[in-house]
């Protein structure tokens, strides 16, 4: 889980108290880890979306026709997408999964090597 954006002041249409540092939840260690700061505040009316390649797109904020408007976006690339030398890491691929799932049922998904516990 990635938490991105927000502020501490609750003041609408303002970048006062902006939280620039995203955090990632590690379910194994049950701890949050801070990652690299955002370059632009993401406050009121902002959005973050998980992209199909594992990166996170975040954009917007403001909508007040003032300095707190941020009609732009940025893309966060989680560290696990890369090897230590900066090259792209091999990503697991879903090899088999059901076409339909039912609420309350267990879903089994087969993936190529490298998939961790989900």
Each PLM stretch: what is its role?
Residues 1-118:
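Kelch-like beta-propeller repeat domains
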